[in-house]
Amino acid sequence: MTTHLPSTSQNGEEISAEQFNRIFHERNVIVLDCRSNGDSVKRANRFFCSLRLPALLQRRLMGGSMRLSTVPDLKDLNNSPDQCPEVLLIPGDSEQDEQLSAALARNLKSNHYRHFVLGEPVKTLLSQFPTLRDAADENWNTTFQMNSMPGQASGQQASSGPLLNLNQLRLEGEDQGGKQRAEFPVKLTNFLYLGNAETAKNRDVLKKYSISHVINVTSNLPNTFEEDPNMRYLRISADDNASHNLTKFFPEAISFIDDARRNDSACLVHCLAGISRSVTICLAYLMKTEMCTLDSAYEWVQKRNASIAPNFHFMGQLTDYEKMLGLNSNRVGTYPSSAPRSPSCAIEAAAVSQVGGLLTPPPTSCSASPQSSNHSAKSFH
């Protein structure tokens, strides 16, 4: 017996395996899979992603303090149901996965996205519709490209409708109990400061904090005092979007910051606003040198500046980096229960449940070869 397609007015309705298959092939959809493991579903001619959040982000999602930021075009289409993509949500099997999918459903509802939840086990879906099974399980972690459809079959026409812009998902600050946002530069350690564009061009500020090293994490802002022989610059040309992987620059940035420390000086890390790209570099430094988890490093920085908001792809890269450092290699589903080795990162490093990786491309090797830092300016391109 054929099951009728659900009405788009029934937002959040549970659907059968047959309805899922029909919606998947007949409508403009996005599939969000909240399972931490299991059989994969085909991604042909539809945008598909596996939603996996570390503990830090999962807590914010479940607490309602993490919001979905979308592309402007999608916001403009909120009142045009026929043009908006629909979301097919695959809930998780475990208790943690179920909590994640429930929180995501609430988030989708509050942002007025039409979505449906698969009400049958994925095994049932795949047994009834084996063509949905992804032939390449090893490619389970989707690389996010907003201008093309991953896994698009030859000759198939991809949907041209707007997509939920996972590139611009951003971890936004939760309630800080009235804590005022810190003024730049923000002191993270005795030799490491977080700043923005204004900080970087203020000579008095640089002098006040004994800053002689500056990491410029932008592709277009000038190295203002590059001609000063007492100033040293490191440029990491990156924009605040998913097309840039900062992981490969971590080793050189860490070495550059350590050079400032060894010379009894200080290093300023800045981007345009001082909330995303520069924060990512600072987090990587703390994780590597203090051997503390991403959760601990993030909370350390956030307590000093509540306005930090790194985008999800950078957080994903940091999650991969955490794994590469072996900070969570001995656990499955939880962060380490032991406190970080250094007192400077000893911030509530309690074991908290998490779900796998994070909205991120496959891990990128940190094998960028070290370069000499004995000249005043340096650039990455």
From Swiss-Prot:
Record's bilayer topology term: Peripheral membrane protein
One BP term from GO: regulation of cell fate specification
PROSITE patterns assigned: TYR_PHOSPHATASE_2, TYR_PHOSPHATASE_DUAL
Pfam families: DSPc (PF00782)
EC supergroup of this enzyme: hydrolase
Disruption-associated phenotype: Pachytene exit and oocyte development are accelerated. These are associated with the accumulation of smaller oocytes in the proximal gonadal arm, the misalignment of oocytes in multiple rows, a premature nucleolus breakdown and an abnormal mpk-1 phosphorylation after pachytene exit and in diakinesis oocytes. 53 percent of mutants have endomitotic oocytes. Embryo development is arrested before morphogenesis resulting in 50 percent embryonic lethality. In adults, but not in larvae, reduced number of germ cells in the mitotic region of the gonad.
Entry EC number(s): 3.1.3.16, 3.1.3.48
Tissues where the protein occurs: Expressed in vulva cell precursors. Expression is increased in P5.p and P7.p and their descendants during vulva induction. Expressed in syncytium hyp7. Expressed in germline cells.
Keyword annotations from UniProtKB, A to Z: Cell cycle, Cell division, Cell membrane, Differentiation, Hydrolase, Meiosis, Membrane, Mitosis, Oogenesis, Protein phosphatase
One example GO MF annotation: protein tyrosine/threonine phosphatase activity
Reported effect, P310L: In zh32; at the restrictive temperature of 25 degrees Celsius, 87 percent of mutants have endomitotic oocytes
InterPro entries: Dual-sp_phosphatase_cat-dom (IPR000340), MKP (IPR008343), Prot-tyrosine_phosphatase-like (IPR029021), Tyr_Pase_dom (IPR000387), TYR_PHOSPHATASE_DUAL_dom (IPR020422)
Catalytic activity reported: O-phospho-L-tyrosyl-[protein] + H2O = L-tyrosyl-[protein] + phosphate; O-phospho-L-seryl-[protein] + H2O = L-seryl-[protein] + phosphate; O-phospho-L-threonyl-[protein] + H2O = L-threonyl-[protein] + phosphate
Tyrosine-protein phosphatase domain span: 184-327
Annotated spans, KIM: 56-68
Location of the active site: C271
Extent of Polar residues compositional bias: 365-381
Family membership: Belongs to the protein-tyrosine phosphatase family. Non-receptor class dual specificity subfamily.
Protein role: Dephosphorylates MAP kinase mpk-1.
Domain notes: The KIM (kinase interacting motif) region may be involved in the binding to MAP kinases.
Name by which UniProt lists this protein: Dual specificity protein phosphatase lip-1
Name of the gene: lip-1
